[in-house]
Amino acid sequence: GLVGEIISRGDFAIDIGR
């Protein structure tokens, strides 16, 4: 999200937050 963060897990990333 814009005020979230990117969590890298293996070969993919998850964009969390609003």
Curated annotation (Swiss-Prot):
Enzyme class: transferase
Known cofactor(s): Mg(2+)
Reaction it catalyzes: a 2'-deoxyribonucleoside 5'-diphosphate + ATP = a 2'-deoxyribonucleoside 5'-triphosphate + ADP; a ribonucleoside 5'-diphosphate + ATP = a ribonucleoside 5'-triphosphate + ADP
Record-listed E.C. numbers: 2.7.4.6
GO molecular function ontology, one term from the record: nucleoside diphosphate kinase activity
Residue pairs linked by disulfide bridges in the UniProt entry: none
Single GO BP term: nucleotide metabolic process
Family: Belongs to the NDK family.
Function in brief: Major role in the synthesis of nucleoside triphosphates other than ATP. The ATP gamma phosphate is transferred to the NDP beta phosphate via a ping-pong mechanism, using a phosphorylated active-site intermediate.
Protein name in the entry: Nucleoside diphosphate kinase 1
Organism: Pseudotsuga menziesii
Organism phylogeny: Eukaryota, Viridiplantae, Streptophyta, Embryophyta, Tracheophyta
